Amino acid sequence: ANSAHDRAYAWDRTKKCIDIAKAVGSKAIVLWLAREGTYIREAKDAKLAYQRLLATVDAMLDYDQDIEIWIEPKPNEPTDQAYVPTIGHALTLSYASKDHRRVKGLIESAHAMLAGLDASDEMAFALAHDKLASVHLNDQNGLKYDQDKNFGGANLRAAFNQVRVLEES
């Protein structure tokens, strides 16, 4: 956000989320960045936005020395152009962070498909870096809004390839 007030509010909420995760015994918190982006490119400084995202990831790592951060990328919706649209972007944030071992990726099949990518390839990429923390297996019929279809409901072959990649890892 461009507003310092909004960023401070978001940081307070983030700390509360980490505290709740710890209270219920969770070792991880999912960072879903689909709202981190823009509808109008000229409205935000993208370089500064990426720097702020990294600073926030580092602050989260400092706030709780044990928590893992699982970044779930999504290319659009609700924001038209997200700053972390793919697992490659998420892993770049991970490697740039102060403790990349605690920053991993969570892939939702439909989100990869919305980016025009093959979800099984995204999973294989994250697995090759030992950074696939979790998956949400679902399906998508084209580059529309996030449909959250049942896994294999639109493309059985794509579903098979995701299972194959996960089984072979």
Residue map of PLM features:
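Active-site acidic/histidine proton-transfer and metal-coordination neighborhood
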Residues: A1-K104
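Gly/Pro-rich active-site loop or hairpin
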Residues: E42-Y50, D80-G88, H111-S169
